[in-house]
């Protein structure tokens, strides 16, 4: 038995138990109730089946129908408690038969059996019902933890991970954990109790027969443990292929226009079919192995029953150690213990699949949060003086060479309060990276970024970002109403404040003309709106937040002339009295900036006003002339 438990439980289930230690504590009361009802179920099951012995003795007239014994006093020297209890039970049945007849005694014992079975099944139901809140609660908690972790991770994490893979972990892997691991909770908290009580009962009935039975259990456990380990390896591969499938679906949905424009439907279909077929082949192997659990445990259980029948028959026929009804009761108890053991074997196939998924989930849950507060961060509620880049250098690690590739090199820049500074340059020169350092989406490798003389690493991240408003090239909106999108950064805003923000952003007119006004749903990512409308809604959102620092990252580069005019007008209203850092592709939009910094290969190569830079006849002048052609 010990070897069996080691191969079936402690090998594949050690990780399982570690997972439960992480997630079960909030549900201890349900766990306690489940254990209580499982104990009741086991005890009631034993007593209900124990009623079979006198029934069989009456039916088959063993010892003349029932043993004839004298009543034993409990304080007498009559042997063990078991012997006294058994003797007195038969004594009362014997007296009942004498008074009421054997058929009546049979009916009463049958009613007792039915009543005990009713209580047993009730306890069994309650034990399973109390597991459900644990199972569903843990799955909910895992999803919450993944989502919260996603929100806490830095943007750098997602530049190295595919969105489809993350979605697959949130959906497919969590679902697999629920199906494979959480479905085994009932097995874990119920079956050990049943096995313990039934095993003790088997020893009480016949320790010789039980000892003989134990000899056959370890080989069964070893076989199932080996299969379970192989199943986990295949499951990890299957879940990785599922992530590839989800990633391709996500990429396809985001690139449908390009796919259609290049007539690449057939090409993408073939590629998806290859990925999907690989997943199918792998998951098929996993499921075939999983389906082995029931027939294999059924076959091994039958072998065990046959062996016990043979050895038990010897004890009955040759030695007379136990009688026929007792051996039948023993077989019933043995069959009862086989079912929980079958569940363990089934779990040894199921749980490795869930553990493989949990490994992938933990890659997110245990990922290091690089951007976080210090133990004692400085708090800030207002912006008073300036933003400063002091000898700032920023690099990312190249995946192939593992070397640092510098995007920014020794940047020095002071942005006084109330001023507008524009960053221009070719694609890849580091403009967007530079503005991403202000709200601390990334941390610099060298130098420091300061707000009012305080390093942003020393500030509370929440306080820092509450000072900053963002309007990006791609207006990021949510599948909600106009109202909910505009008040995203200020949930307590009044309807009047929301309307005023929309008016300043030149969005009020088209919002009020929509079907339900400010309560109109704008669709996934604002898909029901034009590019200019989406941008004006995002500007209204920034206006309502009313931040002292504003970051504009090519906010008008993807718009037509009319939309650009409306958006530019809204931006100019937004920029009044605010400190603004603008990344610009169209130089015409930043002519009036207080200072323009020209970036080239990660360095500031020129700086000054528009007129000053034109007179320099340098890099900025070349960019300007190219846009005039």
Residue ranges and their predicted role:
Residues 45-53, 107, 112-163, 167, ...:
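Juxtamembrane helix-loop junctions of ABC transporter transmembrane domains
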Residues 25-29, 155-156, 172-181, 185, ...:
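An intracellular "coupling" helix at the cytosolic face of ABC transporter transmembrane type-1 domains
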Residues 10-21, 57, 64-93, 129-175, ...:
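Extended non-transmembrane interhelical loops and adjacent amphipathic helices
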Residues 56, 115, 146, 150, ...:
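Hydrophobic/aromatic residues within transmembrane alpha-helices of membrane transport systems
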Residues 201-215, 224, 289-359, 364-365:
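Helix-loop-helix
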Residues 1-50, 59-113, 119, 126-131, ...:
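Membrane-integrated ABC transporters
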Residues 36, 123, 127, 171-216, ...:
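Hydrophobic alpha-helical transmembrane segments of ABC transporter permease domains
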Residues 4-9, 374, 380-629:
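ABC-type nucleotide-binding domain
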């Amino acid at each position: 038995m010990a070897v069996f438990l080691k191969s079936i439980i402690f090998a594949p289930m050690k990780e399982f138990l570690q997972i439960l230690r992480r997630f079960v504590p909030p549900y201890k009361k349900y766990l306690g109730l489940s254990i209580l009802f499982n104990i009741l179920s086991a005890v009631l099951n034993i007593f209900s089946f124990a009623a079979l012995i006198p029934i069989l003795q009456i039916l088959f007239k063993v010892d003349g129908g029932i043993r004839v014994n004298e009543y034993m006093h409990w304080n007498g020297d009559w042997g063990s408690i078991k012997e006294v209890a058994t003797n007195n039970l038969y004594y009362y049945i014997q007296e009942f038969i004498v008074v009421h007849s054997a058929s009546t005694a049979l009916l009463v014992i049958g009613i007792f059996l039915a009543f005990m079975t009713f209580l047993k099944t009730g306890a069994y139901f309650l034990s399973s019902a109390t597991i459900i809140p644990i199972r569903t609660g843990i799955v909910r908690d895992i999803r919450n933890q993944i989502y919260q972790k996603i929100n806490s991770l830095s943007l750098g994490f997602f530049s190295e991970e595919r969105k489809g893979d993350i979605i697959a972990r949130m959906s497919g892997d969590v679902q697999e954990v629920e199906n494979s691991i959480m479905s085994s909770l009932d097995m874990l908290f119920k079956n050990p109790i049943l096995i313990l009580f039934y095993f003790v009962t088997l020893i009480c009935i016949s320790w010789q027969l039980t000892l003989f039975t134990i000899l056959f259990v370890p080989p069964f456990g070893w076989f199932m443990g080996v299969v379970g380990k192989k199943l986990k390896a295949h499951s990890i591969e299957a879940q990785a292929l599922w992530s590839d499938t989800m990633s391709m679906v996500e990429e396809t949905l985001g690139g449908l226009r390009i796919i259609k424009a290049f007539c690449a439907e057939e090409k993408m279909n073939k590629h998806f079919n290859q990925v999907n077929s690989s997943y199918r082949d792998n998951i098929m192997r996993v499921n075939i192995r999983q389906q082995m659990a029931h027939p294999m445990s059924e076959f091994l259980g039958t072998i065990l029953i046959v062996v016990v029948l043979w050895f038990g028959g010897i004890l009955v026929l040759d030695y007379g150690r136990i009688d026929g009804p007792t051996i039948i009761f023993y077989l019933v108890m043995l069959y009862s213990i086989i079912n929980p053991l079958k569940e363990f074997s089934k779990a040894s196939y199921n749980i490795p699949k869930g553990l493989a998924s949990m490994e992938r989930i933990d890659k997110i849950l245990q990922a290091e949060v690089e951007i976080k507060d210090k133990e004692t961060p400085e708090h800030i509620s207002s912006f008073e003086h300036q933003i400063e880049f002091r000898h700032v250098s920023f690099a990312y690690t190249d995946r192939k060479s593992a070397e640092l590739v510098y995007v920014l090199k020794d940047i020095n820049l002071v942005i006084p309060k109330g001023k507008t500074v524009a960053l221009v340059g070719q694609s890849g020169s580091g403009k967007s990276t530079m503005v991403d350092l202000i709200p601390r989406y990334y941390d610099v490798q060298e130098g420091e970024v300061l707000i009012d003389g305080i390093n942003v690493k020393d500030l509370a991240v929440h306080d820092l970002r509450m000072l900053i408003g963002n309007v990006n090239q791609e207006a990021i909106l949510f599948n909600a109403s106009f109202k909910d999108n505009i008040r995203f950064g200020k949930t307590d805003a009044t309807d009047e404040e929301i309307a005023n923000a929309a008016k300043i952003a030149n969005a009020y007119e088209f919002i009020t003309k929509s079907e339900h006004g400010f309560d109109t749903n704008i669709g996934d990512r604002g898909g029901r709106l034009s590019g200019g409308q989406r941008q004006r809604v995002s500007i209204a959102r920034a206006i309502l937040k009313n931040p002292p620092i504003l970051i504009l990252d090519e906010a008008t580069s993807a718009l037509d002339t009319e939309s650009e005019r409306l958006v530019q007008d809204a931006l100019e209203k937004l920029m009044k009295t605010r400190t603004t850092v603008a990344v610009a592709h169209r130089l015409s939009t930043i002519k009036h900036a207080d200072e323009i910094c020209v970036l080239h290969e990660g360095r500031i190569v020129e700086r000054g006003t528009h007129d000053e830079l034109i007179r320099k006849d340098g890099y900025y002048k070349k960019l300007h002339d190219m846009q005039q052609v």
